[in-house]
């Protein structure tokens, strides 16, 4: 079974900064990680390959430094890695990102396209479903369990108050949530092979054979008006006096603010 896994290198959420001029995330010089939900997608793809055979290919779109994320994916157990990188991709919204990724996916034979539910730097959860739409294949989102039965999958999809069990044939796109599994740590051998024996192949806009006006900022119908970080500062208050008085004052204050 051939599985494509889409991963994204995202800023570590503990180090998020906003450019005051462009109102977008500052990514340069910020520690980056593989998007957490994407790791769950990759782990499940590797588990499926271990059960039924096949190949796991990871694909990412981003600047050249995204190669680090792809190397980590190779160390975890992916077989091949491709990086979509080109100035033509810069400034892409979810629609233009899905356009580029779907064009890349069309170059591969695949049974499953796996991606995370959403990226922690945007939280839109749009790219996966948009890719499925552009590829004209079925999709199952919020996946928490996958079983293989021949050429079809039995998938559990999480809901707010329960779950659905869905039977779907391949090819199909799945979006993973953290309840799906616990991603493995790369082994020493895996890390060595990822950096010494495996290659990260580059795909540019020219390789996708698509009108560049449909990519990047030019191909993005969504325009970011503003981005900001929430104020995390909290005012503190100290209640003095004996314990009984302090507790009474605390209860009165909480009541006045309708907390209790």
Curated annotation (Swiss-Prot):
InterPro entries xref list: ET-Flavoprotein_bsu_CS, ETF_a/b_N, ETF_b, ETF_beta_N, Rossmann-like_a/b/a_fold
Species: Thermoanaerobacterium thermosaccharolyticum (strain ATCC 7956 / DSM 571 / NCIMB 9385 / NCA 3814 / NCTC 13789 / WDCM 00135 / 2032) (Clostridium thermosaccharolyticum)
Residues in the signal sequence: none
Disulfide bonds: none
Entries under PANTHER family matching the protein: ELECTRON TRANSFER FLAVOPROTEIN BETA-SUBUNIT, PROTEIN FIXA
Subunit architecture: Heterodimer of an alpha and a beta subunit.
Domain of life from the UniProt record: Bacteria
Family that this chain belongs to: Belongs to the ETF beta-subunit/FixA family.
Protein name: Electron transfer flavoprotein subunit beta
Encoding gene, per UniProt annotation: etfB
């Amino acid at each position: 079974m051939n599985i494509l896994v889409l991963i994204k290198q995202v800023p570590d959420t503990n180090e998020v900064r906003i450019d005051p001029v462009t109102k977008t995330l500052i990514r340069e010089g910020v520690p980056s990680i593989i998007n957490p939900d994407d790791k769950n997608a990759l782990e499940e793809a590797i588990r499926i390959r271990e059960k039924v055979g096949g190949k796991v290919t990871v694909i990412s779109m981003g600047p050249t430094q995204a190669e680090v994320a792809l190397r980590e994916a190779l160390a975890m157990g992916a077989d091949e890695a491709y990086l979509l990188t080109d100035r033509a991709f810069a400034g892409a919204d979810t629609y233009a990102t899905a356009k580029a990724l779907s064009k890349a996916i069309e170059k591969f034979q695949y049974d499953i396209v796996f991606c995370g539910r959403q990226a922690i730097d945007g939280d839109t959860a749009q790219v996966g479903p948009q890719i499925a739409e552009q590829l004209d294949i079925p999709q199952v989102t919020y996946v928490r369990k996958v079983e293989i039965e021949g050429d079809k999958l039995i998938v559990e999809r999480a809901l707010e108050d329960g779950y659905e069990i869905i039977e779907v044939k391949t090819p199909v796109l799945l979006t993973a949530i953290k309840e799906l599994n616990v991603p493995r740590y790369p082994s020493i051998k895996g890390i060595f092979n990822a950096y010494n024996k495996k290659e990260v192949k580059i795909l540019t806009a020219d390789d996708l054979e698509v009108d560049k006006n449909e990519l990047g900022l030019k191909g993005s119908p969504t325009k970011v008006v503003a981005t900001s970080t929430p104020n995390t500062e909290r005012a503190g208050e100290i209640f003095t006096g004996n314990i009984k008085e302090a507790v009474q004052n605390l209860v009165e204050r909480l009541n006045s603010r309708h907390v209790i």
